[in-house]
Design a protein with these regions (language model features):
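Alpha-helical transmembrane segments in multi-pass membrane proteins
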Residues: 4, 8, 12, 16, ...
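Helix N-cap/coil-helix junction residues
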Residues: 24, 184-185
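Structured core of small recognition/catalytic domains
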Residues: 117, 186-187, 195
Length: 205
């Protein structure tokens, strides 16, 4: 709950592995943690709603892609469950996804520490421009003050929804870094928007 309100994550990336380590079968750990994420995300969203620290337009676009991604994830989950391989899939998914995200964040942390030690002042943009920013259907998100292709949040939602369905997480541990580095949203709007998306994605799971 504390992590949910502070960082905009549901906490599933911590609780689901913890439940598995306690001896609970992965298939049940995923289902149980989805309920916990839904409750904590709803509470956090209400708080950010009253504080007006949410970008609803961005959130709805991510949700649109998220519901489709969740549907694909459920199909994948059902397939591997049918061939009795779902436990292995969940374990491998956690290992690879957390390792990849952790390595990127570790790299950024080391670079920032090195920059501080060298006392180098770098004026940088909110986010780096990648090929994905050249996609069509650009739209203005006035709350976040960004001008971005509508396909970016939709594609992000598909990825988040797919991972959420398989791993039993809200996907915020992936969504929050993407909002910062890929979309360039203001930090103050990210927790509320992330929790808002998590309600619908996890609820569909």
């Amino acid at each position: 709950g504390f992590l949910s309100g502070l960082f905009g994550v549901g906490g599933g990336f911590l609780m689901t592995p913890f439940l598995i380590f306690m001896g609970i079968p992965p298939i049940y750990a995923v289902a149980n943690e989805a309920n916990n994420i839904l409750a904590s995300s709803t509470s956090g969203t209400l708080t950010h709603w009253f504080k007006k620290t949410m970008d609803l337009k961005m959130g709805w676009m991510i949700i649109g892609g998220g519901l489709f991604g969740t549907f694909l994830g459920i199909l994948t989950f059902s397939y591997f469950k049918g061939i009795n391989k779902i436990d292995i899939v969940i374990a491998l998914a956690y290992m690879y996804v957390l390792a990849i995200i952790g390595s990127f964040m570790l790299r950024d942390g080391i670079m920032e520490i090195d920059r501080i030690k060298k006392k180098v002042i770098i004026k940088k943009k909110l986010h780096t421009h990648y090929w994905i920013h050249g996609l069509p259907f650009r739209t203005r998100f006035r709350t976040s003050k960004v001008y971005e292709s509508a396909l970016v949040p939709v594609l992000l939602g598909i990825l988040v929804g797919y991972i959420a369905a398989i791993m039993g997480v809200g996907g915020a541990f992936l969504m929050v870094p993407a909002m910062i580095y890929l979309i360039g949203m203001p930090i103050k709007l990210i927790p509320g928007t992330s929790l808002f998306v998590t309600i619908f994605v996890t609820g569909f799971v």
